[in-house]
Amino acid sequence: MSKLFDSRLADVIRKPVITEKATNALDLNQYTFEVDHRAAKPQIKAAVEALFSVKVIGVNTMNPPRRTRRVGKFSGKRSQVKKAIVRLAEGDKIQLFPES
């Protein structure tokens, strides 16, 4: 990998998605992240493996259309969001929630 690619790995993953559906998928060893909309599946896989030291089996992505927001008479668009569902190898785990 080139140094440019290595430096962008941390910028690929924005934040984990915490919804009921994403939380239920944790039982299947699948983690959902919001990622940069320009990121490709190999980049997402490399970023997760490098940042969390786990083995990624597969990556599914979804790129829904931008939503229009309206405030008074002004209309605008929300920022582009791309989600990635990452499936990990058996036995690997990512600590998303702090343990109490």
Curated annotation (Swiss-Prot):
Q: Which Pfam families match?
A: Ribosomal_L23
Q: What InterPro entries does UniProt report for this protein, alphabetically?
A: Nucleotide-bd_a/b_plait_sf (IPR012677), Ribosomal_uL23-like (IPR013025), Ribosomal_uL23/eL15/eS24_sf (IPR012678), Ribosomal_uL23_CS (IPR001014)
UniProt GO molecular function: rRNA binding; structural constituent of ribosome
GO CC annotation, single: ribosome
**PANTHER family, per database record:** 60S RIBOSOMAL PROTEIN L23A
Q: Which GO terms describe its biological process?
A: translation
The organism of origin for this protein: Prochlorococcus marinus (strain AS9601)
What family does the entry list?
A: Belongs to the universal ribosomal protein uL23 family.
Q: Which UniProt keywords apply?
A: Ribonucleoprotein, Ribosomal protein, RNA-binding, rRNA-binding
What protein am I looking at? Large ribosomal subunit protein uL23
Annotated gene: rplW
